[in-house]
Amino acid sequence: MIEQSLDNLILASSSERRVALLKQINIKPGLVLPADIDESPLKKELPKDYSIRMAKSKAEKIQSANPNYFVLGVDTVVACGRRILLKAENVEQAEKCVRLLSGRRHRVYTSVCLLIPDQSKQHIRTVVTIVKFKRLSEQEIKYYLASEEWKNRAGGCNIQGLAGMFVLFLRGSYSSVIGLPLHETNCLLSNYFNLY
């Protein structure tokens, strides 16, 4: 298959996983630019709303400097109930997240925002996936934390790596949990690009 190079598409992300996921469906953005935004949740902000706001903010930040481009902003949020689990900045935070998720269901919200040049239009899709982890032993928790796979991961979890062995079930989109819902992203982009 030939990879589609979409020269006038910017992926507003620093995530190599998202670039790899786009490549999986033969899409190569013209540019990949990280958006430096404040990612602090608002008081009492719900996980889905936070995910949408972050995806939109990332896209808007990049498009403000590149108004003639389509911009794809994406954000993935792990939530236990209404509690948003941010990226762990240290091993203590990662341990809190892993212990909280142990033996429980949690939701992963991934929002995709596509901005059209000059912000004449915006499209937002959010995919919710339910994931259940097995009850983790102390040994498993220590082993996972020592791996440092939790670094720069929403909720401190990398199901492509070691945390994959903790998943009892996943209901929804696997690619969304990794960082980009492929079906929804393909549908959004195919409205504006000839992908086939």
Swiss-Prot record:
GO terms for molecular function: dTTP diphosphatase activity; UTP diphosphatase activity. It is an enzyme of class 3 (hydrolase). The active site is at residue 75. One of its GO terms (biological process) is nucleotide metabolic process. The keyword NAD does not apply. Keywords: Cytoplasm, Hydrolase, Nucleotide metabolism. The record marks 17, 76, 160 as: Important for substrate specificity. Pfam families: Maf. Its EC number is 3.6.1.9. It is found in: Cytoplasm. It catalyses: dTTP + H2O = dTMP + diphosphate + H(+); UTP + H2O = UMP + diphosphate + H(+). The keyword Glycoprotein does not apply. Its main location: cytoplasm. It comes from the Bacteria. One of its GO terms (cellular component) is cytoplasm. Nucleoside triphosphate pyrophosphatase that hydrolyzes dTTP and UTP. May have a dual role in cell division arrest and in preventing the incorporation of modified nucleotides into cellular nucleic acids. This is dTTP/UTP pyrophosphatase. It comes from Wolbachia pipientis subsp. Culex pipiens (strain wPip).
